[in-house]
A protein has these predicted regions:
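Conserved phosphate/anionic-ligand binding catalytic regions in large, soluble enzymes, centered on
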Residues: 1-5, 74-92
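Carboxylate/His-rich catalytic cores and anion/metal-binding grooves
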Residues: 1-25
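Short acidic, glycine/serine/threonine-rich loops at helix termini
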Residues: 7-13, 46-51, 85-92, 119-121
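Well-ordered, non-membrane alpha-helical segments in soluble/globular domains
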Residues: 13-20, 53-62
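Acidic, His- and aromatic-enriched active-site or binding-groove loops in soluble protein domains
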Residues: 17-28, 95-113
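Structural preference for beta-strand elements that scaffold enzyme active sites
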Residues: 33-37, 73-75
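Acidic, glycine-enriched catalytic cores built around paired aspartates
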Residues: 39-42, 50-60, 80, 91, ...
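Non-transmembrane, aqueous-exposed alpha-helical and coiled segments at domain scale
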Residues: 58, 62-69, 93
Length: 193
């Protein structure tokens, strides 16, 4: 699920899949856990960083709820890039930012080639990054199982975030659809190099 529309359809898509008995049997035969990938890079290119991050957050909540409803464990594979615009950034912060109840002792994410040397090129730095990822996973799995705020506060916050994401999406799409922007971008940057 990589584009904004894909992320928005994650709930209906998973519900439809899990309603098909042969598909459920396949999940059972493969260990009983469904893996679902959420894409950071394409959703960011499609909708801008604010909308992308918010739609990913909502998709993760939908995944959690569907897993709870169906009893099928869902492992989320985070398709993150190296830069902030592609979902990159500190791994531990990304893990801790997951909605409550999403992580259950496991997480899967990509580390792009451009950050491998930075994060794992020296044994001490590699140990530190793995330590931070592991402790974040433990904290998110054990301490973030239930909401940290009351339902009214969460509902109000989600409403504000929906409005912000909608406004950000409209602004971003107006910008990237500006006539001549692609020509200007390709002639004024080294994108073709």
């Amino acid at each position: 699920f990589e584009t904004i529309d894909d992320l928005r359809s994650i709930g209906p898509t998973l519900r439809a899949l899990f309603a098909v008995d042969p598909y459920r049997r396949i999940v059972d035969l493969r260990g009983g856990t469904q893996e679902v990938m959420v894409g950071y890079s394409d959703s960011n290119k499609d909708g801008g960083i604010t909308t992308s991050q918010w739609e990913i957050h909502k998709a993760l909540r939908a995944i959690r709820d569907i897993s709870d409803e169906t009893g099928i464990p869902i492992r989320v594979f985070h398709g993150r890039g190296g830069t902030i615009g592609r979902g990159g950034g500190p791994t531990h912060a990304s893990i801790l930012s997951q909605p409550n109840g999403v992580l259950d002792g496991e997480v899967k994410f990509t580390e792009q080639g451009e950050v491998i040397a930075d994060k794992y090129g020296h044994p001490d730095i590699a140990r530190r990054n793995l330590y931070l990822a592991f402790t974040a996973l433990l904290e998110a799995s054990l301490a973030h199982r239930s909401p940290s705020h009351d339902e009214e506060t969460i509902t109000r916050w989600y409403s504000i975030m929906d409005d912000m994401a909608d406004d950000a999406y409209a602004s971003y799409r107006r910008f990237v659809e500006t006539p001549g922007l692609v020509d200007y971008f390709t002639t004024s940057t080294p994108v073709e190099e």
